[in-house]
Design a protein with these regions (language model features):
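Bacterial N-terminal signal peptides that target proteins for export
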Residues: 2-14
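Oxyanion-binding "anion nests"
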Residues: 267-316
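Aromatic- and glycine-enriched pocket-lining scaffold segments that form the walls
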Residues: 173-239, 248, 263
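Acidic/His metal-coordination segments adjacent to aromatic residues that form catalytic metal sites
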Residues: 67-70, 115-122, 173-178, 242-256, ...
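CBM-like carbohydrate-recognition segments
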Residues: 40-85, 97-104, 113-131, 137, ...
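Inter-helical turn/loop segments and adjacent helix faces that build the functional surface
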Residues: 199-214, 273-285, 338-346
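Long, well-ordered core segments of solenoidal/helical folds
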Residues: 49-71, 105-123, 154-173, 213-239, ...
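C-terminal motif of bacterial Sec signal peptides marking the signal peptidase cleavage site
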Residues: 24-25
Length: 421
């Protein structure tokens, strides 16, 4: 009995020693990995290497700030919204360009998080008919192309159903949201039309496709007709067909100011839609002509010294106005992509490059660890709602300004990729 007790104690001791050894080995392994990681960090000295091109530097900085893509635009919990898709467009192009798996994983994890196995889109409500909600469909189009997961197809079909039910003005333009009746916002062209065109190219055939393409081009024709100011060449932020909104001019239905980012959205909408609109569609030539007149107007309001654009485009000297990052990045992207695609003559590259250099010189800062920041971004601006947004000059210049807004970092990545071609 005594020997049995001693043997049992010896076994326990042996297990303890073995366990300690395993623990020590694990601890040593972890220490080695930690030591190696800290050594690599100390050798490079940077979380984001400074020898990379600006597109990757900004993308990696966003991934550092927002480890999961649903966090982009400072989201506190996963929700279906539009800003993530702009940055993920850059991630997609960087993955195609570099083959680095981390970019694809960042996109893929967004889809996994936001789309349930039955194809339900997290936090999305089709009945709101909010055109903003279509933009992230572009991410799903890419993921479905790559992974062919049924849940992505179901989610895409749901978003396409929204287009069928989206309320319209009497002449056929999409309302921006169901809660904003008869209102067309420039923002909505970017939020809805690239997705609508891309979906049509991938999934719609024959007469249905022709009808959809005509509908898409009509949205731009209608905006040119109803929102364009012929004197400046700029387009107003929004138009109320009913002329009932307090912000709307009682004769024209137009909002009172030229908001930089609204114009930015519109430019990106045109240049991105052309990626999917058939080459033989007669509407292509019209949209290209709109890009030309749009760019001419934008260049007129580019600051001669900095190369940047103001929050309210036509009032650079007014009290409180400022050179704003998101609009500046969007204008640069629209013009340089248009030059690269042949929609604009090469002479327009100078204005785009001046704007791009102006962003880097005046709006970009780099932390000691290499993380890149884009400053002076307007966080949000809109019309109507609660509290009521009246579209006045004072309203636009007093909205929150912040750094690293996805509505600026995304277009900056995309513009950088165009300059790096």
């Amino acid at each position: 009995m005594t020997m049995s007790f001693i043997n049992q104690k010896l076994k326990i001791y042996a297990v303890a020693v073995l366990g300690s050894g395993m623990f020590l080995a694990c601890a040593q392994t972890k220490t080695t990995v930690a030591s190696k990681t800290s050594k690599e960090t100390s050798q490079s000295g940077k979380v984001v290497p400074t020898n990379l091109k600006w597109s990757e530097r900004m993308m990696l900085s966003e991934m550092q700030r927002f480890p999961e893509a649903w966090m982009l635009d400072f989201s506190k919990s996963p929700k279906w919204t539009y800003p993530s898709a702009i940055v993920l467009d850059g991630a997609e192009q960087l993955y195609i360009k570099t083959g680095k798996q981390e970019y694809y994983d960042y996109i893929s994890e967004f889809g996994e998080k936001l789309i349930k196995e039955d194809g339900t889109i997290l936090t999305y409500d089709i009945e709101k008919y909010n055109i903003d909600m279509l933009n992230s469909g572009n991410v799903l189009l890419y993921l479905y192309e790559k992974e062919k997961k049924e849940k992505y197809l179901k989610a895409l079909q749901t978003l396409r159903l929204q287009i069928d039910g989206q309320p319209r003005t009497n002449e056929g333009s999409f309302w921006h949201k169901k809660i904003y009746p008869y209102q067309v916002w420039l923002d909505g062209l970017y939020m809805g039309m690239p997705f609508y065109t891309h979906y049509t190219k991938d999934f719609t055939k024959g007469a249905d496709a022709a009808k959809a393409y005509n509908d898409i081009v009509f949205q731009f024709d209608s905006v040119q007709k109803n929102l364009l100011d012929k004197k400046t060449g700029l387009l107003y932020h929004a138009w109320d067909e009913s002329k009932k909104e307090a912000w709307a001019n009682k004769e024209t239905g137009l909002s009172p100011n030229f908001w930089g980012r609204a114009m930015g959205w519109y430019g990106m909408a045109m240049v991105d839609v052309l990626d999917y609109l058939p080459e033989n569609h007669p509407g292509r030539a019209r949209i290209i002509s709109y890009i030309r007149s749009y760019s001419d107007a934008v260049i007129k309001y580019q600051d001669k010294k900095s190369g940047l654009w103001y929050q309210v485009l036509d009032k650079p000297l007014a009290n409180g106005n400022y050179e704003e990052a998101t609009a500046s990045a969007m204008f640069v992207y629209t013009m340089i992509k248009s030059v690269n695609k042949g929609y604009l003559p090469k002479s327009y590259k100078a204005a785009a490059k001046k704007g791009y250099d102006g962003i880097i010189k005046n709006l970009i800062t780099v932390d000691e660890n290499g993380v890149v920041n884009l400053n002076k971004c307007c966080a949000v601006a809109g019309l109507g709602g609660k509290p009521y947004r009246d579209g006045s000059y004072e309203y636009y210049v007093n909205e929150e300004i912040r750094s690293n807004d996805g509505k600026g970092t995304g277009p900056f990545i995309l513009a950088s990729l165009e300059f790096e071609k």
